Amino acid sequence: VNERLKANALSIIQANDLDETKDTLTVKCEVISADRKRLTAVYKGDRMSDGAAYPVSVFYTNTMDLNQVRDLGLSDFTDGYTMAGYVLSDDVEFLGVTQEQKEAFLKYRDSLDMDILTEVFNGADFPLASENAWPESFSYESHGTICFSVPVPHALGDYVIVTFNPSTK
């Protein structure tokens, strides 16, 4: 289990083709839940590529089924199509965004459609499709609420976290 968690945590380096001698990656891990069945780690930070004008905000998660030693992802809790519809709906809710950030995202959202978002969410989370493919979205479940990232332009913060509570929808 520990080796799998470590490999997933460090996979951002190869998947984003980071040069450890020139690029900078700063990530903090928070274990948001852990019990005998499941462990969920949330990683947040920044990466700065050599020669880049600014750092990019990084968000990724790893939820592991400890009994089966397998990664759990968005598809274990819901489906990409449903979440795409939710993100495009008037009911969408966010985690940790200001009113200004919410308004900016809602304007940006007009450039998105069901197909784009469904593809993003269907490819969310670990395991990676290949060692050089990094998902555009990561998710976790906390107390019945599904939290997942939506990629946005750098000017909007690189990602927003959307929350979905199936029991209230």
Give short role names for the model-derived ranges.
Residues 1-169:
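Compositionally biased intrinsically disordered regions enriched in Thr/Gly
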